[in-house]
């Protein structure tokens, strides 16, 4: 009972933002010193209601792919899916299907919240058979898609500039720490979309043993400063240059996008 209460207390305060019919479109771009900022990919995040094994669920799918003009360089077609219990608002399943050039990878996580465990299964292109592992959960353990929605659940009234929070990101056979820090409010211009009031966060990913940060694991997120709390812009450095993802379209939002200034 205590663990269930703890789980409920840790649930996203704005978890009602699992909004059926919501569609968020993003464009991904790359830029470097001698390489202009160029759009190379797209991502669509959708939320629908469905029944799974007789239970009401939200199905959230994030589907990213390379734009046609760049598929000859690297043909990316990645899909991530979560099923969320509509009553308890806890993720029940996570699946990934990653196709990047000749690389293939598949994974599946099944959450057992009463036992506070997660059963993971994964297989790569060169693996003869899939691999499995069972790991312990805490109320702060989440897969990457669930983390995306957790950031949307933050209550802006409780934010303190410089304050750090730590979550746990599940990755097949390990759990990595995700540390995020509120940097303050900022007006952000988004290409072809306009200017928005945003909440700015710095995020870092470490190992399960601690914060052993390497190049590319630190990134910045700008979230709309309104009731929708949409990630509007993400920027991450890479070895040469940086990659960005920014909102390019939306519909089916639960609330007006009041953060848009012009």
Language-model features: where?
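Acidic, serine/threonine-rich low-complexity disordered tracts
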Residues: 8-111, 156-262
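Active-site/ligand-binding surface loops and adjacent short beta/alpha elements
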Residues: 113-171
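Structural motif
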Residues: 4, 88, 115-117
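Short, small-residue-biased leader/transition segments that mark boundaries at the very start
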Residues: 1-7
